[in-house]
């Protein structure tokens, strides 16, 4: 793909997000993933990790509707502007800590049907450091699901192709019955980001 087309596509989704009142163009990544894989249902309890600014949580809030059967818990170290939806709750905290995980479990009165993570590490431009940070973040998400995801639940997470990418997939295959990777049309083609669809959580082995 040419740089011109990549820039054009990025601007297209940015403008579309502004027009449709989404907080980021990343909203379209989840919409495309859900359309392809049917990941979200109206009565699901969903936890969105690294949720700021809230684009994915907006999509979930649309899906679970106004009946209040499902819930969306958005977690981030940064402040997230609340979403005007009765099923929404924001949590400002570090999802890798037990304290924040306990808050999540209490809020959803059990465990989540789906865990989402579009989180990305802070990049330095130094390849080795950035690869390590991306791997470290992915593994943090994989570890937290033991505590907050229901048996047979699903995980949708961003991962970055690099030296440790296959190690991430290997770890997920140990925990889930089915693992697929994909790149939505709204992702930049030159980007190293991939999205992992992991379904059928086997449950914690602890």
UniProtKB/Swiss-Prot annotation:
Answer yes or no on keyword Ion transport.
no
Kindly name one Pfam family recorded for this protein.
Answer: FtsJ
Matches recorded under InterPro entries:
RNA_methyltr_RlmE, RNA_MeTrfase_FtsJ_dom, rRNA-MeTfrase_E, SAM-dependent_MTases_sf
Q: Name one GO cellular component term.
A: cytoplasm
Q: Which GO terms describe its molecular function?
A: rRNA (uridine-2'-O-)-methyltransferase activity
How would you classify this enzyme at the top EC level? Answer: transferase
Record keywords: Cytoplasm, Methyltransferase, rRNA processing, S-adenosyl-L-methionine, Transferase
The protein's predominant localisation is: cytoplasm
Stated EC number for the protein is: 2.1.1.166
Enumerate the SUPFAM superfamilies for this protein. Answer: S-adenosyl-L-methionine-dependent methyltransferases
Where is S-adenosyl-L-methionine annotated to bind? 54, 56, 76, 94, 118
Q: Where in the cell is it found?
A: Cytoplasm
The protein's annotated catalytic reaction(s) are: uridine(2552) in 23S rRNA + S-adenosyl-L-methionine = 2'-O-methyluridine(2552) in 23S rRNA + S-adenosyl-L-homocysteine + H(+)
Q: Which residues form the active site?
A: 158
Q: What does this protein do?
A: Specifically methylates the uridine in position 2552 of 23S rRNA at the 2'-O position of the ribose in the fully assembled 50S ribosomal subunit.
Q: Which family does it belong to?
A: Belongs to the class I-like SAM-binding methyltransferase superfamily. RNA methyltransferase RlmE family.
Q: What is this protein called?
A: Ribosomal RNA large subunit methyltransferase E
- Provenance organism: Methanosphaera stadtmanae (strain ATCC 43021 / DSM 3091 / JCM 11832 / MCB-3)
Classification of source organism? Archaea, Methanobacteriati, Methanobacteriota, Methanomada group, Methanobacteria
């Amino acid at each position: 793909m040419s740089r011109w087309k990549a820039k054009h596509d990025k601007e297209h989704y940015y403008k579309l997000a502004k027009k449709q009142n989404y907080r980021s163009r990343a909203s379209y990544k989840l919409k495309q993933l859900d359309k392809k894989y049917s990941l979200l249902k109206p009565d699901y309890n969903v936890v969105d990790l690294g949720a700021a600014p809230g684009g994915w949580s907006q999509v979930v809030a649309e899906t679970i509707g106004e009946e209040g059967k499902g819930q969306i818990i958005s977690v981030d170290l940064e402040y997230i502007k609340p979403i005007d939806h009765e099923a929404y709750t924001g949590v400002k905290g570090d999802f890798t800590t037990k304290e924040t995980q306990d808050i999540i479990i209490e809020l959803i009165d059990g465990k989540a049907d789906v865990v989402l993570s579009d989180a990305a590490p802070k990049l330095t431009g130094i390849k080795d450091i950035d690869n390590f940070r991306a791997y470290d973040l992915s593994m943090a998400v994989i570890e937290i699901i033991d505590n907050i995801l229901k048996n047979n639940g699903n995980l949708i997470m961003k991962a970055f192709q690099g030296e440790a990418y296959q190690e991430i997939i290997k770890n997920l295959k140990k925990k889930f019955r089915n693992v697929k990777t994909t790149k939505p049309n709204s992702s930049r083609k030159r980007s190293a980001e991939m999205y992992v669809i992991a379904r059928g959580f086997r449950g914690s082995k602890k």
